[in-house]
A protein has these predicted regions:
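General nucleic-acid-binding
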Residues: 352-419
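Short coil/turn linking the two alpha-helices of tandem helical-hairpin repeats
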Residues: 115, 197, 279, 300, ...
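TPR/Sel1-like alpha-solenoid repeat signature
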Residues: 62, 126-133, 145, 162-173, ...
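Helix-turn-helix DNA-binding segment
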Residues: 422-468
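Alpha-solenoid helical repeat architecture
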Residues: 2-6, 34-45, 73-86, 113-128, ...
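Inter-helical turn/loop elements of alpha-helical hairpins
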Residues: 1-71, 90-102, 133-140, 144, ...
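Tetratricopeptide repeat
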Residues: 24, 31, 59, 65-66, ...
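Residue at a conserved register position within TPR or TPR-like alpha-solenoid repeats
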Residues: 15, 50, 91, 133, ...
Length: 469
């Protein structure tokens, strides 16, 4: 990834994108043979080889070695640039988001104006920062990263640079709620990756995630879950753990939406067990917390929700859950709804639906808001969001009848399907808010303790336990 000679940097970057670690090491040895003084260059290429192999433990050890070796030498600044780049990838892979900020800030501060590595590495770092920003719903930062990428003066027009820019562009469009456009960019980027053999560290996991979210937004749940499974497989293979847990959470949510709460909480429990078994430090515990929060809100477990809300980052869903718990407690303020942001399509549709629900007793007002929301849904592909507004189905149907189009008639059909699905769930005794005793049982089930032990602890018979289940 480092270019000892200016003409070689594109070739070296392709080696890195294609996981050709042996060739990187051989190139480093060739550099050393041509010029025995270029020890630092050879060592950095060896570090990058560890990195593109996704051997992050080996890469971290190599970072320590070469930082120690070249401290207080003429090569120290160059080595520091290379190791901060490496640590950015390592910290992201391990989900160390706090340390990731430190390594990225150092790299950007020391390489933005006078890069010590070639400029493609600058875009690489920005892509990592964009991925972290998307995971944490830091959408303003994500947008500024993309702006910096497209304004950055690069020295060549190679496909791998376009690939980096497209990765972030797709994420930005998704953050805006422009799922149709985001999916188009992500699909093209996936094709670039296939055509050029980009794997390992540069695998198109972020673009696949955008495609999965776009499918989910379009109410294509089966397609979305298939992509999420592919992401989990690829993330495991290349040790990209944030992506694994982000994708896994949607399996839990899918079970929860089907009222399969035991299965949903079992996935959350397995996530926590997997994280606890890692032999490296990380900042990923918030992901199963978020996944559990989603399950808890469906059963109105306000007490457990509050515990989770107190310890998770302030993601978009977290803000929505806080507002929901206030509503359940009888706190409804029109000021809160009217002050909701509405710059992007994602923000606009959420605000319109929220206002439609607030004015549900004033039907004509609610229908007008919902009609506007449906127009945005058609253009952006935010179908599933509308289909999950169970309390507003009557308002949605009246909005559809206001001015039926092909899309709105399609939405009417999907609403009817959801009503039938909900009726089927109700015939099975779901979804009814759980009693306090049932909630207590569910809380214990999420800990992984055997049912017999829970029965004994709560002084509940096994038959009663089965009834609660």
């Amino acid at each position: 990834m480092y270019h000892p000679y200016a003409m070689a940097h594109v070739e070296l970057r392709e080696m890195a994108f294609q996981m050709r670690s042996a060739e990187l090491r051989n190139y480093g040895q060739d550099v050393l043979k041509r010029d025995p003084k270029r020890v630092a260059a050879a060592e950095v290429l060896d570090l990058m080889a560890y990195l593109v192999e996704c051997d992050f433990v080996g890469a971290e050890a190599k970072v320590d070695t070469i930082k120690f070796r070249f401290k207080n030498t003429s090569d120290e600044a160059y080595v520091d640039a290379a190791t901060s780049l490496a640590m950015s990838h390592i910290n992201f892979a391990f989900g160390r988001f706090k340390e990731l900020d430190i390594s990225i800030d150092y790299f950007l501060a020391n390489n933005r104006a006078l890069p010590k590595l070639e400029k493609g590495e600058f875009l690489d770092i920005l892509r990592i920062l964009a991925q972290k920003s998307m995971i944490l719903d830091q959408f303003d930062r994500l947008e500024s990263i993309y702006k910096e990428m497209i304004e950055y003066e690069i020295e060549d027009q190679s496909p791998n640079l376009l690939y980096l820019v497209n990765s972030v562009h797709a994420m930005v469009l998704m953050s805006h709620g422009e799922f149709i456009k985001a999916n188009e960019v992500a699909r093209r980027n996936l094709e670039i990756a296939k055509q050029h053999g980009y794997i390992g560290l540069m695998a198109p996991i972020d673009s696949m995630y955008v495609m999965a979210r776009a499918a989910l937004a379009g109410a294509k749940n089966k397609e979305a879950l298939e992509i999420f499974d592919q992401i989990k497989e690829m993330a495991t293979k290349y040790s990209q753990w944030p992506w694994y847990f982000m994708a896994d959470g949607y399996s839990s949510r899918e079970h929860a939406l089907k009222n399969e709460m035991t299965e949903a909480l079992a996935i959350v429990r397995e996530e926590r067990e997997k994280l606890a078994a890692f032999n490296f430090k990380h900042d990923l515990n918030f992901i199963p917390d978020i996944n559990e929060l989603y399950v808890r809100h469906l059963i109105k477990d306000i007490e457990r929700m509050q515990t989770l809300l107190d310890r998770v980052p302030n993601l978009i869903m977290v803000q929505q859950m806080r507002a929901l718990t206030e509503e359940w407690r009888g706190v409804q303020k029109i000021d809160w709804y009217e002050k909701l942001p509405d710059r992007t399509p994602r923000e606009k549709i959420y605000k319109l639906v929220a206002l439609a629900e607030f004015y549900i007793d004033k039907e004509s007002v609610a229908v007008d808001y919902m009609f506007q929301a449906l127009q945005i849904a058609e253009v952006t592909g935010q179908v599933e969001f509308i289909l999950r507004q169970y309390r507003l189905f009557d308002i949605i149907q009246k909005a559809i009848a206001k001015k039926p189009t092909v899309f709105l008639e399609y939405m009417g059909t999907r609403i009817a399907e959801r009503i039938n699905q909900n009726n089927e769930k109700n015939r099975k005794g779901l979804p009814v808010p759980l009693t306090n005793r049932e909630l207590e049982v569910v809380r214990h089930l999420s800990t992984g303790i055997p049912i017999s032990a829970i029965s004994s602890s709560l002084h509940v018979s096994m038959n009663t336990m089965k009834t609660h289940l």
